[in-house]
Regions:
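Short, surface-exposed recognition loops or helix-turn segments adjacent to catalytic cores
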Residues: 13, 28, 144-149, 176-179, ...
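Active-site-proximal acidic segments at structured loop/helix or strand boundaries
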Residues: 161-207
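Basic, flexible linker segments flanking DNA-binding modules
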Residues: 1-53, 118, 125-128, 204-207
């Protein structure tokens, strides 16, 4: 319009010199305020899959599906599977519901198991297979925009990659089947030591 032809790099440099642009490396890190815990057990359950060398060099790496109650930090469900998949979450969620009942909501990332892409949404397919199953069970499915938003399960993954790996080593456990058999014992001990008391004693799980 004004007959000025400048490269992007030149415009960026002018903006930096004028104080209108801050290079990414010089920007202060974003501070993510921790979200308050929910009040009741079963009100919100964070779920995630953690791909890791759970058996160290004794067996191939696999994925651990982790279900953490938001109000208490309790481990509610652990399942070792070959990889994160819809079928794996079906299996883990069925076991969860059979043991605890139906939570009010699951909180996950935006992986394809939980959230359809824009094209599928435009075609009118509003749910993934897993999302449809949760809808039929009357369980809300919430997706986090960032990994920090589901920080409790992310931090739990880190704890498990240290503590659970050591326990598996001590017990000579080197297979998913054996690890899944041990998971209930591990969860009971972990929760007895580290779970927090919720603000409300109401259990929000439903039959």
């Amino acid at each position: 319009r004004h007959g000025i032809d400048l490269s992007k790099a030149c415009v960026r440099r002018i903006m930096i010199d004028a104080g209108f642009w801050v290079p990414r490396k010089q920007r202060p890190p974003k501070v993510h305020q921790p979200r308050n815990r929910r009040a009741c057990l079963g009100e919100l359950v964070q779920i995630d899959g953690s791909d890791h060398a759970w058996f160290e060099d004794r067996a191939p790496a696999c994925t651990l599906l982790v279900y953490v109650d938001d109000a208490t930090g309790r481990l509610m469900q652990l399942l070792f599977v070959p990889t994160e998949s819809t079928q794996a979450y079906f299996t883990a969620t069925r076991a969860y519901v059979e043991r605890h009942g139906k939570p009010q909501a699951f909180y996950s990332d935006k992986a394809g198991v939980f959230r359809i892409n824009a094209r599928e949404n435009a075609e009118g397919r509003g749910y993934t297979q897993f999302g449809r199953a949760l809808f039929e069970l009357n369980i809300d499915s919430l997706c986090a925009n960032t990994s920090q938003a589901k920080g409790r399960v992310e931090r739990m993954n880190g704890v498990l990659q240290d503590r659970l790996v050591k326990e598996l080593r001590l017990r000579g456990i080197s297979s998913m089947a054996a690890a899944n058999a041990y998971a209930l014992t591990f969860m009971a001990d972990f929760n007895a030591r580290f779970a927090k008391v919720p603000r409300s004693d109401f259990d929000a799980h439903r039959p």
